[in-house]
Amino acid sequence: VVVGLSGGADSVCLFLILEELRKKIGFEILAVHVNHGIRGEEAKADEEFVKTLCEKKEIPCRSVSVDIPKMAVEYRMSEEEAGRTARREIFEQAAEEWGGTRIALAHHQDDNAETFFLHLARGSGLRGLGGIYPVNGMYIRPLLCVGRKEIEDYLKGREMPYCIDATNMEDAYMRNRIRNHVIPYFKENINEKTVEHMNRSMDQLREIWDYMERQTESAYQICTCLLYTSPSPRDS
């Protein structure tokens, strides 16, 4: 399993859980850290934290540096999109070179709620409103069933430190604005369990989409079969 390890609370939690499961099940782990070239010394400190954690747990670690601002300009995309693209390429390359069959990412319920708002605002259809899938190809997201607070409480209980990305508190990115303002507003003024309820709705939307996909494929196969088995006009 290739695990994305930024050093933040979410990825550290996932790393520790996989490390515990590794002892019981017997699979191998490769931690991959991506330095986005944005936060200077803070990013270097995160990288050192990740390397130290992996050494302590005797888990191999691969660290890759990318100039995300430069990549964003070259490919005419936002830094958020450039970061996602770079991470995906790095994780998949690591999996291919190392022989990994799964890539584990630390998305959780709060991330999924943010994604729902983003997709809703952009006019996404049923597939997009289903949010993040727990399993999508070789990608797995074991923490999608828990929230950010549960993750932080888990780390606190284990007395495990983690890195804090100060840019997450800035409103420079749309996702940050949703995280820092929209979701807190819903929790405080509408329903304190907004995130949990949204994730439940997204689960149902994913089930509906998957059902429609299966039914569409089944109908297509029937139509194809009828097309190739129907007698031609000359035979009638």
Predicted segments — roles?
Residues 217-224:
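An N-terminal amphipathic alpha-helical segment
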Residues 181-187:
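Helix-loop "lid/cap" segments that line or gate small-molecule binding pockets
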Residues 159-161, 224-227:
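Short acidic (Asp/Glu) and glycine-rich catalytic loops that position anionic groups and cofactors
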Residues 187-211, 215, 230:
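An accessory alpha-helical subdomain
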Residues 1-181:
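Core alpha/beta nucleotide-donor-binding catalytic domains of modification enzymes
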Residues 228-236:
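Single conserved hydrophobic/aromatic residue that forms the stacking wall/gate
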